[in-house]
């Protein structure tokens, strides 16, 4: 694509169409842009539009399109073509910083994100002048430019907060500090001076405080991994100014908005975070500043209002106190009883109250409420921070704190009892307080794992939780119902089983509650209870114990999916999946009805898949229906095919990318259930599975390979006769997969199935070419993963076609190649093979090479016989060699190129491990002994001589053990 006015005009028209609400106009425009984005100059045309277009809407659209293009294509993925030509990469990096800084804020943010994506890949090695260019802009004095630089630096450096320590990371941070720390500090001081100068200018203050927020965020990122020497030397400057800003109050920066945090709140919140970081990680160096910060933050807490806009500030301030009180250094600041009482009374209890804003979220924004409350994204809420402070105080003062709070809990419950309909919020706070007090350690998976022994959890459950749940009206006091259900979830490991069993029918009835939060919590609680393990590592609740409730459980779960707001509720679908898994054959009578409902749901959501977790659990539930029913009655597979195939066809025809990998997995499960030949409905699909376009999407590959393996296992003879012309296509898929480091193991899965199941004559003409392809890959790009897969394949080939056939095919490619493969690959690398079945295949294959390959006994290959036997005994007896060559250590084969749909394995579609030598060989050590005995019978005297003269003593001892166990000798 040329950088011409005509192309700019065309691009403008298509960008405009991508904003059209009509899909008939929008989608073709999106497809067109996708089709041209691989052309040279495409990204430069977008940047030119950004600079030259007069239409602001088009400029914003171009900036978003450019950012998404960079997100999808900038990373260079091994084995994949480079999606952006080098000239475009150079031009983008040369122009983007200037363009970003000279653009309006809306566009600046998009380009700043694009710079951070590029920087993540290229900085510092491939973009060494980025920092210099950014730092030089600090001198401009233009805070629009300066804030652009700070915003970009923040998005570049914030990853230092969660990266693992490494030399590479240290080197990068040092480079950044050397270039950035001093200019940032000077800018910090200058900005604070300007705040004093412009103290009465609201618009100037807004810009300056935006800068201070970004500077404070950068301080956090640059100090997170370790305390840099520069910041230690300049701690006075930073901490004194942070303290001043923390105590600052300027009427011009206060906002009337009760919801949205203002600049002053955001800055103080970040300073609390910075102080907490230093208090936690660098307490020795920070010690002399700490008392001033504790005082300032305490004053902040007792003077800040209850409005939502202060939530982040208050929660960060409380988190600061929580991090301080946990450190032995600062224990003395909190040990006075009056201090503890004051903290409880003035900070913890007020911030645990259920406010009008919380009630509004509970009723009108339930999805967000659940996300915060159940999934732990409540990190910045007042309640969560207050809860963390309680836990922190309990570390050293558990007795006094429990005593103080017990009084509060009792008085709250008394207030509630006086007038429940008015005072229900008192009980809500009491439950939350008990939960905070009792929870010492908690995980999402297991609930509370360590509890405060001073709190009687069962007594509280029986007296205050069960009565609410036993009420006949499931819609009364929904917040308290949700609290009670959450209590069951959190303390499920502490409450005795008999009480939990009583709760199950109550939870089932709450699936009918109108409140989204209540019926979601009920579903989640049931799912968590059904995954609990008993003492013998089976489920705590048996199918027999749940049997009385099966019908009402399944009815209410599926009915809950019809309640307003829950048509794609992932917690309900997960509970359905877990119920199926626990109840097993007890669900069979209900399956005809349930599979219809699941299929209807699948058809509905396939129109616009938007809830990935819901979709995943739905497919898991479908797989469970198939597994459980067909285990009892394999012929029932036909009923599932009738129910599902119409929907599956629609999904495949409409190219619903998110669902295609799932469809292939379910089809594999169905096909594997057939015991005889492949039904014609599957064979009609077979040619379509080989289309290259399907294999271009990484997320499809594991599911497609599994499905092709099912075709080969169930219908190799049909393929050989009715679809012989498709065998080259099948091998073409293998060739594509084997060329990729990320997918070569999938290529071997396919190849192994071809070798194991296809009639030999149908692949004869391709065999030599298969080996040549494998050797080319070995030569060009040898990895440990490839070697392991290659070893399994050649041994499987040996088992299937015979040892002599393996030797002949190697030597047919190149004279003496068989010896080279033995010497350079099999003998030194066999120790790396992992997996019981894989080791067994290799053991049986090598045994065949040792005992059924005449050239091993009477040619130049004979010298390799004993080393090969030695390596086989090593495979049996030595630990697996899991060392990885240095150059391979950093290959990340899991990287998904761009933003394609990743593969999601369905647990309940899982394939049983297949052992191709299971019927032939039970114990490979005994098999070796018997095979050596047979060989020694054919060549008397030779085998004992070779073994006794060349095998090391330890290996010889192991071999004698095998012979003894097999009751044979070497003649």
Curated annotation (Swiss-Prot):
What InterPro entries does the entry give?
A: ARM-like (IPR011989), ARM-type_fold (IPR016024), Importin-beta_N (IPR001494), XPO2_C (IPR005043), XPO2_central (IPR013713)
* Residues of the Importin N-terminal domain: 29-102
Q: Which residues carry this modification: Phosphoserine?
A: 112, 931
Q: Per the database entry, which stretches of residues form a coiled coil?
A: none
Q: What is a single molecular function from GO for this protein?
A: small GTPase binding
Query: What is this protein's record name?
Result: Exportin-2
Q: What does this protein do?
A: Export receptor for importin-alpha. Mediates importin-alpha re-export from the nucleus to the cytoplasm after import substrates (cargos) have been released into the nucleoplasm. In the nucleus binds cooperatively to importin-alpha and to the GTPase Ran in its active GTP-bound form. Docking of this trimeric complex to the nuclear pore complex (NPC) is mediated through binding to nucleoporins.
Its quaternary organisation is: Found in a complex with CSE1L/XPO2, Ran and KPNA2. Binds with high affinity to importin-alpha only in the presence of RanGTP. The complex is dissociated by the combined action of RanBP1 and RanGAP1. Interacts with CFTR.
When this gene is knocked out, what is seen? Complete embryonic lethality at around 5.5 dpc.
Q: Which SMART domains match?
A: IBN_N
């Amino acid at each position: 694509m040329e950088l011409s006015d005509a192309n700019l005009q065309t691009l403008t028209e298509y960008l405009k169409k991508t904003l059209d609400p009509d899909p008939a106009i929008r989608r073709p425009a999106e497809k067109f842009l996708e089709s041209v984005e691989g052309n040279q100059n495409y990204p430069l045309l977008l940047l030119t539009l950004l600079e030259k277009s007069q239409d602001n809407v088009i400029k914003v659209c171009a900036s978003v399109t450019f950012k998404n293009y960079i997100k999808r294509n900038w990373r260079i993925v091994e084995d994949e073509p480079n999606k952006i030509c080098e000239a475009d990469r150079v031009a983008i990096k040369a122009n983007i910083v200037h363009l970003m800084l000279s653009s309006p804020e809306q566009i600046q943010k998009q380009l700043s994100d694009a710079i951070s994506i590029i920087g993540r890949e290229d900085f510092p090695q491939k973009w060494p002048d980025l920092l210099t260019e950014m730092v030089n802009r600090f001198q401009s004095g233009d805070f629009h430019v300066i804030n652009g630089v700070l915003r970009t630096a923040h998005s570049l450096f914030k990853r230092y907060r969660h990266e693992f320590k490494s030399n590479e990371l240290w080197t990068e941070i040092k480079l950044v500090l050397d270039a950035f720390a001093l200019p940032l500090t000077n800018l910090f001081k200058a900005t604070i001076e300007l705040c004093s100068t412009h103290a009465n200018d609201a618009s100037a203050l807004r810009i300056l405080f935006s800068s201070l927020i970004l500077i404070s965020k950068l301080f956090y990122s640059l100090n997170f991994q370790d305390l840099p020497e520069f910041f230690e030397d300049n701690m006075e400057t930073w901490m004194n100014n942070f303290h001043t800003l923390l105590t600052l109050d300027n009427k011009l920066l206060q906002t009337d908005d009760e919801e949205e945090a203002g600049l002053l709140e955001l800055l103080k919140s970040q300073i609390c975070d910075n102080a907490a970081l230093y208090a936690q990680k660098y307490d020795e160096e920070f010690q002399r500043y700490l008392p001033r910060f504790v005082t300032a933050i305490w004053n902040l807490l007792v003077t800040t209002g209850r409005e939502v806009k202060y939530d982040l500030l208050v929660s960060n301030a409380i988190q600061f106190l929580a991090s301080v009180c946990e450190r032995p250094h600062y224990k003395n600041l909190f040990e006075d009883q009056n201090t503890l009482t004051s903290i409880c009374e003035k900070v913890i209890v007020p911030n645990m109250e259920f406010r009008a804003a919380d009630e509004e979220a509970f009723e009108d924004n339930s999805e967000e409420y659940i996300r915060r409350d159940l999934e732990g994204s409540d990190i910045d809420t007042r309640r969560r921070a207050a809860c963390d402070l309680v836990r922190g105080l309990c570390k050293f003062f558990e007795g006094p704190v429990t005593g103080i709070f017990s009084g509060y809990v009792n008085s709250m419950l008394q207030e509630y009892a006086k007038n429940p309909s008015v005072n229900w919020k008192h009980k809500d706070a009491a439950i939350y307080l008990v939960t905070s007090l009792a929870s010492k350690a908690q995980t999402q998976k297991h609930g509370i794992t360590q509890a405060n022994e001073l709190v009687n959890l069962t007594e509280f459950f029986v007296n205050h939780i069960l009565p609410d749940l036993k009420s006949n009206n499931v819609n009364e006091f929904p917040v308290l119902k949700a609290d009670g259900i959450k209590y069951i979830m959190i303390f499920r490991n502490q409450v005795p089983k008999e009480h939990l069993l009583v709760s199950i029918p109550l939870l089932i009835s709450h699936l009918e509650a109108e409140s989204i939060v209540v019926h979601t919590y009920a579903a989640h609680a049931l799912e968590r209870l059904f995954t609990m393990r008993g003492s013998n590592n089976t489920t705590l609740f048996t199918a027999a114990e749940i049997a009385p409730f099966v019908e009402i459980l399944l009815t209410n779960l599926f009915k809950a999916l019809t309640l307003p707001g829950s048509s794609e509720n992932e917690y309900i679908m997960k509970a359905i999946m877990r119920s199926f898994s626990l109840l097993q054959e007890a669900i069979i009578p209900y399956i005809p009805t349930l599979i219809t409902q699941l299929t209807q749901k699948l058809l509905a959501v396939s129109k616009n898949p938007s809830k990935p977790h819901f979709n995943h659990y739905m497919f898991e539930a479908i797989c469970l229906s198939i597994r459980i029913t067909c285990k009892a009655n394999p012929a029932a597979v036909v009923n599932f095919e009738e129910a599902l195939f119409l929907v599956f066809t629609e999904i495949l025809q409409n190219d619903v990318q998110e669902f295609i990998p799932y469809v292939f997995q379910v089809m594999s499960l169905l096909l594997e259930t057939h015991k005889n030949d492949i039904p014609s409905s599957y064979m009609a699909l077979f040619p379509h599975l080989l289309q290259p376009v399907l294999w271009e999407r990484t997320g499809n590959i594991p599911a497609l390979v599994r499905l092709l393996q099912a075709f080969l296992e169930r219908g190799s003879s049909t393929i050989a006769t009715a679809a012989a012309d498709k065998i080259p296509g099948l091998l073409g898929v293998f060739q594509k997969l084997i060329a990729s480091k990320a997918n070569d193991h999938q290529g071997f899965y396919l190849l192994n199935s071809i070798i194991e199941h296809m009639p030999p004559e149908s692949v004869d003409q391709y065999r030599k070419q298969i080996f040549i392809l494998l050797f080319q890959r070995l030569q060009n790009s040898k990895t440990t993963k490839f070697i392991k897969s290659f070893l399994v394949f050649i041994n499987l080939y040996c088992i299937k076609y015979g040892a002599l056939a393996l030797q002949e095919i190697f030597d047919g490619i190149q004279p003496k190649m068989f010896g080279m493969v033995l010497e350079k690959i099999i003998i030194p690398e066999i120790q790396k093979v992992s997996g019981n079945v894989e080791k067994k295949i290799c053991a049986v294959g090598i045994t065949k090479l040792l005992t059924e390959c005449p050239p091993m006994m009477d040619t130049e290959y004979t010298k390799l016989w004993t080393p090969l036997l030695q390596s086989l005994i090593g495979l049996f007896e030595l630990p697996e060699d899991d060392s990885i060559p240095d150059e391979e250590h950093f290959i990340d084969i899991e990287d998904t190129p761009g933003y394609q749909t990743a593969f999601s394995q369905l647990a309940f579609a899982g394939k049983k491990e297949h052992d191709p030598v299971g019927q032939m060989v039970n114990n490979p050590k005994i098999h070796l002994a018997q095979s050596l005995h047979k060989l020694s019978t054919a060549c008397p005297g030779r085998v004992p001589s070779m073994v006794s003269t060349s095998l090391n003593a330890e290996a010889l001892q192991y071999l004698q053990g095998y012979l003894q166990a097999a009751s044979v000798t070497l003649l």
